[in-house]
Amino acid sequence: KLFCYWGRTPKAFEARGCRVFFAGQNSSDTVEANAAVVARRIDEIIALTGAEKVNIIAHSKGGLEARYAISKLGKGKFVASLTTLSTPHHGSKTVDLLRFVPDFLVRLCCKCCDIGFWVMGDKKPDTYGSISIFRTAAAAELNRQVIDDPAVYYQSYAFIMKRPTSDMLMCPHNIFVKLIEGDNDGL
């Protein structure tokens, strides 16, 4: 791993007295597989700290995985809150449109994403294999199956990149997605 995906955020929380843990799932595994990783990590953190509950902050697909762990894997009793950041809870119209793009181009773009995920620490990134969950129909089905636990506090935030050049890694995504879906965080 060449750098921390979360940037300076963990240190900011730790400076305020919070203990920070990472689930360690791969970005491109299925929601179900990564939810199992999240569920195991919740158990480990509870055992390690003696805490009754954890607060989860999840980004992008990680929000779907945390919701699945809470709802389908019974971890709601150990979660006080789930905060999702730029999670595609309703899917992406951009991903829906990929069916009109030649497959070799989609695969090429996915391979470029895989390189970025590998640099961030993923062992075997497979963006092409994991993008189906971002289709709006797949997200709607997931939302039908994954019911919020009434004992968990949920909140969700989305962000807007001011200008595409704010993050050169996200620049191409930002421009493309903005044409289809409007302002976005680059993903």
What does each model-identified segment do?
Residues 1-57, 61-103:
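N-terminal non-catalytic accessory region
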Residues 72-187:
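Helical cap/lid subdomain of alpha/beta-hydrolase-fold lipid enzymes
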